């Protein structure tokens, strides 16, 4: 009797493991589908929507090297490119998780005798016939779920450099100013100014927030006279890091440029 009880307990444990793994895999598959849909939407925006002007890797400058005047569109394209990079990383991790849990499922004792490449778990409770006075709980493995293990989906490879979301831009640079010497140009999109930024989530930027970020930049400039401030920005398809040293010069202010919130 003890052996029978032990076998039943082991069977129940195996069934629980299968149920847990099946639930995890279902959730991961839904996540993978959501990522694929979002990626498709972003790629459509960059390839055939408003973003096709610049596309996935297009330059934000014209043939003569001048920045494009379409600043609002540039911001949206930058956001799309940044989000695609995040999706790529998330997608790779989800695929690793799916592979891990599928392997764990296939190693479970109850599943070793199953040769199908798809699986499903359905809980059913059946009552014995009139010739049997005992009730039994039966676990049936029948109609398979559409989780294929024979072929693994390939990760989506999109080469996009990860950068922060720009929150201010350079609208004017005075010749001979500290900003000019720091190689700042009109149209530069700044995503880090000293301790402000970088930001990688849209909830961290926006109309009101960007105005607050601009005020923080003004404070940093006032408190950094003759001290280097690290700035990171995007110009066309290039990511540039430079040092700006606020100081007194022949013009107005300490940096000689006009910075506006996006």
From Swiss-Prot:
GO terms for cellular component: cytoplasm; nucleus; proteasome regulatory particle. Residues 113-134 have a biased composition (Low complexity). Gene3D superfamilies: 2.30.42.10, 6.10.140.1710. Keywords: Chaperone. GO terms for biological process: proteasome regulatory particle assembly. It comes from the Eukaryota. Residues 106-142 are annotated as: Disordered. Acts as a chaperone during the assembly of the 26S proteasome, specifically of the base subcomplex of the 19S regulatory complex (RC). Belongs to the proteasome subunit p27 family. This is Probable 26S proteasome non-ATPase regulatory subunit 9. The gene is psmD9.
